[in-house]
């Protein structure tokens, strides 16, 4: 985030101690009670900004499922700001294990200075602190950054709040219009990136969050891959790939991308060098090979294939060698997505029984020697699909659909859930939403 200047803030004795580190892989955890106090301000306008900053921080921490923000109505101590040492007994009295104090000021250059300190009320120690210099319009991102710092200090994992989501928005009235849309991870600042004049599918971030790629059907049989610069708004055609049905996924270094292309009755995985535009076919034989996704180090690719009759998940080296099957359960597997941490692969699993189909989102260990009984279903529904990961590899976002009823049309929405299968939440969008893709942490 080049428009934000960040400094570590230490006003009191800083300790490396934190509350017992939260490990969300151990299943459901009791949320840590935290008080986000009113931020001091140097003007009435900044007082309003401070109130909004507190709301965003509290909402971020609540959404994570790991923190329980305490209502300000129960606060006893009236003093606010970062320049005083809190009356810790007053905060312990309302069962606040953690306390956030902060302030908002306007600098001579017109930017905002937003500062915070995180306190442990039982040890009576400062855990962390920082200040951010931001243009006024970026106050919300500074609030997300503060929540990220708090999350990281208490969990040991990077936060994921200062991120973006790109997805397909679909109007709920006829004729239905599909557009590529962009929003903050929590649904704020939603905006449309395409005009709805053509069918659009599978938006994907490039290796940075500055560009996206998506498939657009100029005609029913001709799909184009577009690149859109989110800073300038400029758009260009990457390629006219006959037979492509999904946008490419990009290598971690941003130099290559993988995609599936249908030719002569089979669908295969291809890698494209983005500089030379040279295509390299990675899979062979008959069958449908789709949904490729790179490992975080770029050395492996996971994909699904029906070459053995039923769609299953496979891993291969990034040059197409050493193909290994990694799924062995009952049902069909689809849309694999490799965790940024490298430890898990998320997937969609479809089970057919008694003429009915059940869709599931699951995770499994990423490498063959680890598989055993590692597969775990974390949510199910009429139509759940398109799992993608938060940049810290701790939360999965996916789309969920409901069927049409006599008095209501079907709908699609975006949800998040942690990797243990707890804390499922809907991300509110202006219209129906599907095919989400999560950015990395913004610069």
Swiss-Prot record:
Family the UniProt entry places it in: Belongs to the TolB family.
Annotated InterPro entries: 6-blade_b-propeller_TolB-like, PD40, Tol-Pal_TolB, TolB_N
Subcellular location(s) of the protein: Periplasm
Complexes and interactors: The Tol-Pal system is composed of five core proteins: the inner membrane proteins TolA, TolQ and TolR, the periplasmic protein TolB and the outer membrane protein Pal. They form a network linking the inner and outer membranes and the peptidoglycan layer.
Record's function text: Part of the Tol-Pal system, which plays a role in outer membrane invagination during cell division and is important for maintaining outer membrane integrity.
Name of the protein described by the UniProt record: Tol-Pal system protein TolB
Alphabetized SUPFAM superfamilies for the sequence: TolB, N-terminal domain, Tricorn protease N-terminal domain
Keyword terms of this UniProt record: Cell cycle, Cell division, Periplasm, Signal
GO terms for biological process, alphabetical: cell division; protein import
Predominant cellular place of this UniProt entry's protein: periplasm
Any one GO CC term of the record: periplasmic space
Signal peptide start-end: 1-18
């Amino acid at each position: 985030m080049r428009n934000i200047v960040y400094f570590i803030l230490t006003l009191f004795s800083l300790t490396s101690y934190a509350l017992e580190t939260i490990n969300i892989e151990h299943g459901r955890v009791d949320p840590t009670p935290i008080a986000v106090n009113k931020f001091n301000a140097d003007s009435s306008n900044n007082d309003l900004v401070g109130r909004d900053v507190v709301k965003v921080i509290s909402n971020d921490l609540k959404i994570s499922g790991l923190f329980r923000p305490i209502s300000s109505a129960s606060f006893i101590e009236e003093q606010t700001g970062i320049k005083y040492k809190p009356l810790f007994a007053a905060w312990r009295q309302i069962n606040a294990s953690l306390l956030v104090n902060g302030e908002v000021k306007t600098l001579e250059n017109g930017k905002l200075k937003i500062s915070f300190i995180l306190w442990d009320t039982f040890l009576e120690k400062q855990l962390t602190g920082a200040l951010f210099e931001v243009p006024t319009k970026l106050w919300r991102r500074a609030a997300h950054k503060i929540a990220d710092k708090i999350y990281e200090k208490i969990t040991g994992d990077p936060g994921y709040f200062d991120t973006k989501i790109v997805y397909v928005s679909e109007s709920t009235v006829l004729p239905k219009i599909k557009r590529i849309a962009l929003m903050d991870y929590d649904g704020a600042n939603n905006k449309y990136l395409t005009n709805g004049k053509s069918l659009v599918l599978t938006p994907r971030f490039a290796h940075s969050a500055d560009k996206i790629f998506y498939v657009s059907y100029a005609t029913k049989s001709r799909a184009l891959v577009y690149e859109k610069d989110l800073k300038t708004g400029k758009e260009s055609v990457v390629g006219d790939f006959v037979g492509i049905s999904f946008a490419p996924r990009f290598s971690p270094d941003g130099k290559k991308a993988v995609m599936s292309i249908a030719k002569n009755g089979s669908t295969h995985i291809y890698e494209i060098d983005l500089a030379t535009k040279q295509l390299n076919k990675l899979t062979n034989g008959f069958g449908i090979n789709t949904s490729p996704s790179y490992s975080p180090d770029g050395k492996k690719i996971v994909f699904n294939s029906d070459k053995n009759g039923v769609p299953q998940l496979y891993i291969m080296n990034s040059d197409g060698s050493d193909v290994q099957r990694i799924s062995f359960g009952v049902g069909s597997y689809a849309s694999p997505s490799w965790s940024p941490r490298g430890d898990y692969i998320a997937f969609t699993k479809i089970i057919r029984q008694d003429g009915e189909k059940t869709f599931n989102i699951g995770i499994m260990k990423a490498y063959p020697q680890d598989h055993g009984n590692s597969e775990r279903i974390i949510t199910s529904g009429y139509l759940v699909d398109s799992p993608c990961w938060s940049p810290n590899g701790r939360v999965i976002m996916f789309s969920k659909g409901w069927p049409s009823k006599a008095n209501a049309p079907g709908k699609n929405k975006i949800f998040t859930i942690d990797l243990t299968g707890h804390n499922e939440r809907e991300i509110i969008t202006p219209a129906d939403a599907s095919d989400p893709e999560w950015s990395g942490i913004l610069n």
